[in-house]
From Swiss-Prot:
Naturally occurring in which organism (per UniProt): Molpadia arenicola
Residue ranges annotated for the Globin domain, each copy included: 12-158
More about this protein: Caudina arenicola coelomocytes contain four hemoglobin chains labeled A, B, C, D.
Protein name: Globin D, coelomic
Domain of life: Eukaryota
Membrane-spanning intervals of the chain: none
Quaternary state and interactors: Homodimer.
Similarity comment: Belongs to the globin family.
PANTHER family (UniProt xref): GLOBIN-LIKE PROTEIN
Length: 159
């Protein structure tokens, strides 16, 4: 996978799928810190060892995490990055942005198992936030998008 390969050529997202990703992301970002905090709380619940990768949040309960300044700061950073990735879906820069993310995650020993869990809980959190708006089309668009991104991250991780 070349560094200049575009998101479209990597995954063949349709214009309708891209529109669904962008519109649902806009909905999710109306509660950005709460939504992203929920994703990480779900990760920590499913894999308590993951919480130790965040020393400033280690040992905090879910209730404490929801009000933690560190969690809010992390949620803002993650939501800003994800917004950038979504904004850059159609550009040649996305693989480079993901390569930077991979380098950061490599330093923290984040790998396929962690990406798999993130994808699982991301879908759970999107479904919980969107409720009846979480249609099969929304599910499929997010699943396809995450599979594409995960593929790039794992490929960059291995190289």
């Amino acid at each position: 996978m070349g560094a200049t390969q575009s998101f479209q050529s990597v995954g063949d997202l349709t214009p309708a799928e891209k529109d669904l990703i962008r519109s649902t992301w806009d909905q999710l970002m109306t509660h950005r810190t709460g939504f992203v905090a929920d994703v990480f709380i779900r990760i920590f619940h499913n894999d308590p060892t993951a919480q130790r990768k965040f020393p400033q949040m280690a040992g905090l309960s879910p209730a404490e995490l929801r009000t933690s300044r560190q969690m809010h700061a992390h949620a803002i950073r993650v939501s800003a990055l994800m917004t950038t990735y979504i904004d850059e879906m159609d550009t040649e820069v996305l693989p480079e942005l993901l390569a930077t993310l991979t380098r950061t995650h490599d330093k923290n020993h984040v790998g396929k198992k962690n990406y798999d869990l993130f994808g699982k809980v991301l879908m759970e959190a999107i479904k919980a936030e969107l409720g009846v708006g979480f249609t099969k089309q929304v599910h499929d668009a997010w699943a396809k998008t995450f599979a594409i991104v995960q593929g790039v991250l794992i490929t960059k991780h291995a190289s």
